[in-house]
């Protein structure tokens, strides 16, 4: 239990990229601390597995299959929520290729998911958080996942590195 010293009961957390890896681990840790979860991923099967684990921890869980690069989809998901206390902006993508061989469509997709979608989610959640009653008293948290790769160059990760700085 990573967040054992935290009491997140009555808090609602959104985690993107929640189906696998760090997103999955974050969602489960937040549930262990008592938060209710809204999990987002592109893969229903992964979401179902994580949702089941969260519910075993006695936390409420809503799951949404969504491509976060679709602004209208994420806006609809955010607008459906009665409140948001925490955003873990974790979803991301890497399509390794040597800089001289990066395809324009791959570069544009990585920028869209790693930068634009991250901004859009943070912006939409911040607007929702600001509207909450007692916001000054209870606060809110937005965590945008980054990577050490943003500080290290590499011949096959140039676009990813640029997006993760």
Question: PLM ranges: what are they?
Answer:
Residues 122, 163:
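Active-site helix of classical SDR
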Residues 45, 64-76, 104:
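The beta1-alpha1 cofactor-binding region of Rossmann-like NAD(H)/NADP(H)-dependent oxidoreductases
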Residues 147:
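Residue(s) in the substrate-gating loop at a strand-loop-helix junction
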Residues 35-49:
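Conserved glycine-rich Rossmann-like NAD(P)H-binding loop of the short-chain dehydrogenase/reductase
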Residues 98-99, 103-108:
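Substrate-binding pocket helix/loop in short-chain dehydrogenase/reductase
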Residues 12, 19-21:
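Conserved glycine-rich cofactor-binding loop
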Residues 100, 152-158:
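Active-site loop immediately N-terminal to the catalytic Tyr-X3-Lys motif
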């Amino acid at each position: 239990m990573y967040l054992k010293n935290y009491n997140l009961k009555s808090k609602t957390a959104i985690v993107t990229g929640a189906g696998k890896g760090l997103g999955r681990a974050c969602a489960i840790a937040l549930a262990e601390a008592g938060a209710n979860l809204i999990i987002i991923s592109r893969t229903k099967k992964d979401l179902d597995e994580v949702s089941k684990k969260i519910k075993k921890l006695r936390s409420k869980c809503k799951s949404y299959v969504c491509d976060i690069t679709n602004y209208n989809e994420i806006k609809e998901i955010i607008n459906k929520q009665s409140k948001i206390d925490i955003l873990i902006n974790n979803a991301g993508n890497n399509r390794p290729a040597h800089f001289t061989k990066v395809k324009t469509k791959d570069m544009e997709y990585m920028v869209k998911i790693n930068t634009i979608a991250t901004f859009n989610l943070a912006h939409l959640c911040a607007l929702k958080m600001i509207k909450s009653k007692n916001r000054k008293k209870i606060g809110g948290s937005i965590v945008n996942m980054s990577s050490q790769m943003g500080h290290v160059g590499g011949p096959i990760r140039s676009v990813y590195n640029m997006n993760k700085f």
